[in-house]
């Protein structure tokens, strides 16, 4: 059984995404520190997680050169427990040395043109493109994206996930259309708390609860 531990990072962010659940809902993700990894091994073991996903709270690759000690420590812990790993990022032109350690990289795309920037750095690695479904997205847009991915040698998986608005409420844009194509042409992710969440030695079972009081 696959069980994810989602490590929420906050190294800072470029704040260029058209919609940001963290910024728009004023979620206070704790600042990421090296000492904040002290309980990561226990979190993996106690929750019996076999997959670790790194996301934000700010893009995990933001100013990555200043945080190589954090990445070295975090990934060493994952390897100790033989965890499958993935990284979420919206940086298409950055591939730090530690990225080769991930089994999957999830690229957060804003438009179909972002797909042109995705390519395989390591053949063992899966590339997934993910789009947040916005109010202006059409069925034709979704179909064009799916067509491109199906013909791409560099993108292995495609997913669409629903937007969470400024009141932390899930929207359901193109819901029926996306659900009909789920596991056929793409993965459709309705927003929910699927994972165990970890940030700065704290474990929660809802994303929102990882935030500072």
List where the protein language model places each region.
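Bulky hydrophobic/aromatic packing residues
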Residues: 21, 99, 201-203
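Conserved glycine-rich "GG(E/T)P / GGGxP" loop and the immediately following alpha-helix
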Residues: 23-152, 156-162
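Auxiliary Fe-S-binding modules of radical SAM enzymes
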Residues: 1-2, 160-213
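Canonical Radical SAM [4Fe-4S] cluster-binding loop centered on the CxxxCxxC motif
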Residues: 1-35
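Generic structural signal for short, flexible, solvent-exposed coil/loop and linker residues
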Residues: 2, 6-9, 41-43, 50, ...
């Amino acid at each position: 059984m696959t069980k994810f531990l989602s490590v929420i990072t906050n190294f800072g962010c470029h704040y260029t995404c058209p919609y940001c659940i963290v910024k728009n809902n004023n979620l206070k993700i704790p600042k990421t520190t090296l000492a904040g990894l002290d309980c990561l091994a226990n979190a993996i073991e106690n929750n019996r997680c076999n997959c670790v996903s790194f996301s934000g709270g700010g893009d995990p690759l933001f100013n990555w050169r200043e945080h190589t000690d954090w990445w070295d420590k975090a990934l060493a812990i994952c390897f100790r427990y033989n965890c499958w790993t993935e990284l979420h990022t919206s940086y298409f032109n950055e591939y730090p040395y530690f990225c080769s350690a991930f089994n999957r990289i999830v690229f957060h795309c804003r438009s179909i043109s972002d797909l042109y920037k995705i390519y395989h750095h390591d053949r063992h690695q899966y590339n997934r493109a993910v789009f947040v479904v916005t109010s202006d997205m059409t069925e034709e847009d979704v179909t064009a994206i799916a067509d491109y991915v199906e013909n791409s040698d560099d993108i292995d998986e495609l997913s669409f996930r629903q937007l969470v608005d400024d009141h932390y409420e899930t929207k359901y844009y193109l819901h029926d259309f996306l659900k009909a194509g789920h596991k056929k042409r793409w993965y459709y992710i309705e927003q929910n708390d699927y994972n165990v969440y970890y940030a700065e030695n704290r474990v929660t079972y809802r994303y929102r609860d990882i935030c500072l009081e």
